[in-house]
Amino acid sequence: MARATPGMSGADLANLVNEAALFAVRRGSKQVERIDFENARDRVVMGARRESLVLSAEEKRATAIHEGGHAILTVVLPNSDPLHKVTILPRGMALGVTWSLPEERHTYSKEYFDDMICRAMGGRVAEKIVFGHLNSGAANDLEQATSIARRMVRELSLIHISEPTRPY
């Protein structure tokens, strides 16, 4: 559980324990079990399941292809964190989620960030390969990749941008 909750504060962990207790009560159990903690962690980290959201078969397929693209790259990229879970059940504001568990490290290589950008774009690439076009569902992935690249340039100096040469 500790590995699946990196960066959580004491208050975040207390909230997670309370959520786990609620899941146990809903199951009719007097004991909080591992499954309750896993469900609570998913709810806290990925958002509540949106069971009322009904997707068409086409939307479900597109979401599966998209999340599959993220998952494949998470597994094959050499500097990627290990894949933990993939779901096409809508959670929070997302139609699907691919979740990796970050390994504990104190420094990150340029290659690690490069792979993060590739993973973020994996859903878009999968959609383009399978459907031949993109849809609006990947907008957050583009924002994430842009944010990582911007951080690599502005804060970490991992990419050097030179002035464009002028012909005059």
Regions found by a protein language model. Give the residues of each.
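A short helix-loop-helix "switch/interaction" segment in the helical subdomain of ASCE P-loop NTPases
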Residues: M1-D12
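Short "domain-exit" segments at the C-terminal end of structured domains
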Residues: E163-Y168
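Conserved P-loop NTPase/AAA+ ATPase motor core
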Residues: A11-L158, S162
